[in-house]
From Swiss-Prot:
A Pfam family it matches: Abhydrolase_1
Gene3D superfamilies for the chain: alpha/beta hydrolase
Start and end residues of each AB hydrolase-1 domain: 75-326
Extra remark: Present with 7400 molecules/cell in log phase SD medium.
Subcellular location: Mitochondrion
Organism listed in the record: Saccharomyces cerevisiae (strain ATCC 204508 / S288c) (Baker's yeast)
Propeptide: 39-46
Protein's name in the database: Probable alcohol acetyltransferase
Family assignment from sequence similarity: Belongs to the AB hydrolase superfamily.
């Protein structure tokens, strides 16, 4: 009886012990899960709230004596390039504007392009924050704020910047883009695939710029201007085992996989803002290329909803109008600025 009793008591104690352990384990598991959830929430917040990057840039300084404005600098101009581009693409239009408007012109490399830092995050929110950081850091938000100009992807960055920060800039010029969401551009994905093939060849069959250009021509077509532009996304590296001065292997200058991912996910084609919440009432110019389809007439009411003081200028060129006809682009911008500047 006593043994049975002791066994019963032990069994009861054992049950209590097991239950206590179960409670402890469940509590530990709960605490762990809560900690894990908190960690993921924090990671998500940190991912959403990216630290702005310090962007690479060139500056074309104004000649204060020639322009007659010593001690009274006019609002500067900031120019943003498009996808696959860099600050060098806008040198010609930048020099034109510098000469005709007599002010400093800043040519920026956006994140994951040119000489600017790389990041796994590539969307308009973070890119516009990078540019805002640049303006603030260089104290350009004086005298009414800079004139912001952007082509294609850079145009959406510029639009996002002024809509989110209405007092930051004095004027907007958007070249070949509109505040609309589109389907991801499959053509851009093919561009990246062709460039990655050149990189992955590692000098086996593609050893010169001519051979790289021929590969692009075979893969994406015959537009020489586009091919030349795309090849700036690669850098030549002299082959160690080659006696020929013109034999190279090619490496990525920009993170092609990151940009491909952003294109496929729709980050480049996206437009997340709503004119019911964001509007910009300062002067805005939209330059359209007549041989392109980026800013069709159907988009004009949407542009007007975001930018009620907008106007358009059409130029007979393709999508890369700023490179094809920099002089005509500059003339349109000069006319716009001179009419709207105080």
């Amino acid at each position: 009886m006593m043994i049975l009793g002791k066994a019963g008591i032990l069994a009861q104690y054992g049950t209590i012990y097991v239950r206590q352990n179960t409670i402890r384990n469940n509590l530990s598991s709960c605490i762990f899960k809560q900690s894990l959830c908190a960690f993921h929430s924090l990671a998500k917040v940190l991912q959403q709230k990216q630290v702005p990057l310090d962007l690479s840039y060139d500056i074309i300084k104004r000649d204060a004596v020639k322009t007659g404005d010593e001690g009274k600098p006019r609002p500067p101009i900031i120019i943003l390039h498009g996808l696959f581009g860099n600050k060098l693409n806008n040198r010609s239009i930048g020099r034109n504007l510098n000469k005709k408007l007599g002010r400093d012109v800043y040519l920026l490399d956006l994140r994951n392009h040119g000489s600017s830092p790389h990041s796994s995050v590539h969307n308009y929110e973070v890119m516009s924050e990078d540019v805002k950081h640049f303006i603030t850091k260089h104290e350009l938000n004086t005298n009414g704020g800079p004139i912001i100009i952007g082509h294609s992807m850079g145009g959406k960055v510029a639009m996002m910047l002024v809509l989110k920060n209405p007092q930051l800039c004095s004027m907007l010029v958007c070249i070949e883009n509109a505040p609309v969401s589109l389907r991801p551009n499959a053509e851009f994905v093919e561009y990246i695939k062709a460039l990655m093939e050149i990189v992955n060849d590692k000098g086996k069959t593609i050893r010169t710029l001519k051979q790289a250009d021929e590969h692009l021509a075979e893969r994406i077509g015959g537009n020489e201007l586009v091919r030349r532009f795309l090849l700036t996304a690669l850098k030549k590296v002299k082959m160690d085992n080659s006696s020929s001065v013109s034999s190279y292997t090619f490496e990525e200058r920009i993170p092609l996989a990151t940009l491909k991912d952003a294109i496929v996910k729709g980050e480049i084609a996206a437009w997340p803002l709503d004119p019911a919440r964001e509007r910009w009432t300062r002067p805005a110019l939209f330059i359209r290329a007549t041989q392109s389809h980026y800013v069709v007439d159907e988009y004009l009411p949407i542009i007007g909803a975001f930018f009620p003081r907008f106007e358009t200028r059409d130029i007979d060129a393709g999508h890369w109008v700023n490179a094809e006809k920099p002089g005509e682009c500059a003339e349109s911008i000069v006319d716009f600025v001179e009419r709207h500047e105080d």
